Each structure stands twice: as structure tokens, then as C-alpha cells.
């Protein structure tokens, strides 16, 4: 990408980033259109390609920017002394909320990027996927096993992850999406699952 992109006013940078995040998140790499990105961002295609050269250039920039941005939000939101899995989970959700206040579709984009199977997109984002997974993995590695152990622990935790992801992505499609309201709803689901572990212990 052209480093002069960062010389643009922050509002214009974010408008372009948010437009691209949204289009790629909703459509995946293969079906995302640069025409839709420039329409969403209210810019010309010439300007988009001036800074990013190509569709894959935009996509790889988003992958790098998203992985780094969310890692910073995680580092701000996480108490490194906390060992309870569900309290850590809430901190991660707080980091996601803070991220989505500025970039509503960033986590949605990251989730679709992890599942992307287009060869060019996969090759361009391999390192960023590792960076994201390492950041998340480091956070959860601090959790003490007894805080989430039980006969159905794996199923419960997978169900929780899938529920939070689906809820957030479903609500993002609604123009009235609010990051703080989404955070509160997600925390309520975390509390439900945490309660199940307490009953089983």
C-alpha cells in the first residue's frame, strides 16, 4: 500500500477502512467488489487504487491493520493478573466493544478472514491470522483450568463462542447497531454459561 494513506485526515481513513471492512465481511473475498467499497466510502475507484493498488492490496492491508489494532485493544482491556476464564472472556468482549465503536465490522472481518478459502486471500493473510490467534491464545492461556472445567466444558465453551459471534454478526446487519448494547447482551450470555459451570462444580 501507499504509506501516504496515513497522511489523509483520520475521518477519511476510517471511512475507507470501515467501508472495506464491511464489504469484505459481508461478502467474503471472492464476492466483495471494489465498486461496492468505493460506493460505501463515497470515494472514487482511482483514489482507492492510488493507495492500495488492487483488491488484494486492500484486503491484505485490512488484515494487517485489524490484527494490530485489535491486539492493542486487547492489551488495554486485559488484566494480566486475572485467572478466571469467564472474567477474562468479559475483558475480551470489552476489547471487542471498544474496537467496534470505531470499526464496527472489524471483528466480523477477522472472523470471515479466518474462514476464507480463496488462495490469493489465504496467502496474503497467513501471518495476520497467526498474529491474531497468538494474541487471543496468550490471553486465554492465563485462565486457570478449574474455572472452566466440567463434564461438558468443551461443548459449553464452543456454544458460547458461536452464540456470541452469531449474535454480534446478526446485529451488525442492523443499521441501529450499538457496540455498548451488544457488549451488555454478550456479557449476559457469558454469565449464563458461567452459572452452568458453578452448578456442575
Which residues are covered by each model-predicted region?
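Amphipathic alpha-helical packing segments from all-alpha helical-bundle domains
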Residues: 68-79, 119-145, 154-158, 184, ...
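Hydrophobic/aromatic-rich alpha-helical bundle segments in the mid-to-C-terminal region
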Residues: 107, 111, 122, 144-191, ...
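Short secondary-structure transition hinges
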Residues: 94-137, 173
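N-terminal intrinsically disordered/low-complexity leader segments
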Residues: 1-10, 201
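Hydrophobic alpha-helical connector segments
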Residues: 61, 75-102, 153-160, 183-186
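Generic hydrophobic, amphipathic alpha-helix propensity
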Residues: 12-20, 37, 62-66, 70-74, ...
Amino acid at each position: 500500500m501507499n504509506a501516504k494513506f496515513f497522511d489523509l485526515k483520520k475521518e477519511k481513513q476510517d471511512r475507507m477502512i470501515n467501508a472495506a471492512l464491511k464489504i469484505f465481511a459481508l461478502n467474503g473475498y471472492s464476492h466483495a467488489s471494489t465498486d461496492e467499497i468505493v460506493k460505501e466510502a463515497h470515494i472514487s475507484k482511482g483514489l482507492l487504487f492510488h493507495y492500495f493498488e488492487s483488491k488484494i492490496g486492500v484486503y491484505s492491508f485490512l488484515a494487517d491493520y485489524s490484527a494490530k489494532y485489535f491486539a492493542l485493544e486487547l492489551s488495554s482491556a486485559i488484566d494480566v493478573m486475572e485467572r478466571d476464564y469467564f472474567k477474562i472472556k468479559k475483558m475480551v468482549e470489552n476489547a471487542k466493544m471498544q474496537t467496534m465503536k470505531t470499526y464496527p465490522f472489524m471483528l466480523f472481518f477477522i472472523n470471515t478472514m479466518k474462514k476464507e478459502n480463496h488462495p490469493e486471500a489465504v496467502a496474503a493473510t497467513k501471518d495476520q491470522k497467526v498474529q491474531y490467534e497468538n494474541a487471543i491464545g496468550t490471553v486465554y492461556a492465563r485462565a486457570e483450568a478449574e474455572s472452566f472445567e466440567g463434564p461438558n466444558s468443551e461443548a459449553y465453551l464452543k456454544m458460547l463462542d458461536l452464540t456470541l459471534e452469531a449474535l454480534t454478526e446478526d446485529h451488525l446487519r442492523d443499521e441501529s447497531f450499538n457496540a455498548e448494547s451488544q457488549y451488555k447482551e454478550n456479557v449476559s450470555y457469558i454469565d449464563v454459561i458461567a452459572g452452568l459451570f458453578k452448578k456442575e462444580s
